Amino acid sequence: MDFQFTHYQGNVSVKCSMEHIALANWFNTEVRSNSDKILTALSTAKSLIENQEKVLIGTEYTLFLNADEVMVRANNLAIESDEILEQDFHYYDEESLAFCGTQDFIHFLQSYVDFIA
């Protein structure tokens, strides 16, 4: 997972690789100005054991965490799988849904903590 933190005019923001845009959006809209939320997500991810799942609900995005994977999903992403779309139409959810390994997520958050130190 590729990402880059930048500091501009007193704010830290992150850019992520295309398949992880939802993770960047989560960070930039939900937690960048709230270190408690970052530390909560980091400690939650670090404390997960096998077959354990945690959910962290935010205003715009929700995190679904287990020992192997983290899913970031926009709260407004409500797709009914039985809903029929016109031919050649597809849902665009690249900015609303992202998956990464739990260790990658921990590395991402720890990199932020190191970046602001």
UniProtKB/Swiss-Prot annotation:
Q: Which Pfam families match?
A: UPF0231
Q: Where is the signal peptide?
A: none
- Domain of life, per UniProt, equals Bacteria
> What family does this belong to?
Belongs to the UPF0231 family.
For this entry, the protein name equals: UPF0231 protein HI_1724
Provide the species name.
Haemophilus influenzae (strain ATCC 51907 / DSM 11121 / KW20 / Rd)
